[in-house]
Swiss-Prot record:
This is Ubiquitin-related modifier 1 homolog. Its main location: cytoplasm. Pathway: tRNA modification; 5-methoxycarbonylmethyl-2-thiouridine-tRNA biosynthesis. One of its GO terms (biological process) is tRNA wobble uridine modification. It comes from Zea mays. Disulfide bonds: none annotated. C-terminal thiocarboxylation occurs in 2 steps, it is first acyl-adenylated (-COAMP) via the hesA/moeB/thiF part of the MOCS3 homolog, then thiocarboxylated (-COSH) via the rhodanese domain of the MOCS3 homolog. It is found in: Cytoplasm. The gene is URM1. Acts as a sulfur carrier required for 2-thiolation of mcm(5)S(2)U at tRNA wobble positions of cytosolic tRNA(Lys), tRNA(Glu) and tRNA(Gln). Serves as sulfur donor in tRNA 2-thiolation reaction by being thiocarboxylated (-COSH) at its C-terminus by MOCS3. The sulfur is then transferred to tRNA to form 2-thiolation of mcm(5)S(2)U. Also acts as a ubiquitin-like protein (UBL) that is covalently conjugated via an isopeptide bond to lysine residues of target proteins.
Amino acid sequence: MHLTLEFGGGLELLLENSTKVHKVEVTTPKDGQGKVTMKFLLSWVKENLIKERPEMFLKADSVRPGVLVLINDCDWELCGGLDAELEEKDVVVFISTLHGG
């Protein structure tokens, strides 16, 4: 599944090369469901994109408080949160709202 992942508000600094936009291909889960959920995507991001301090992005199976998540410009909570199912060419944006001033 091809997805576009965008990171902002300082989260891009946790990734290799500090790149804000990543066009990725995520393989479907091997659990037989064949669906890519946000929970699966967060695990995939941790394993494949985060290069340092994953605790600044994730807490347990979800994002840390203060990280805004949008799926196709819609708050992920309105889409189902961790259970939201992603589709081909979706755009997922992660923005940290917590940063120094």
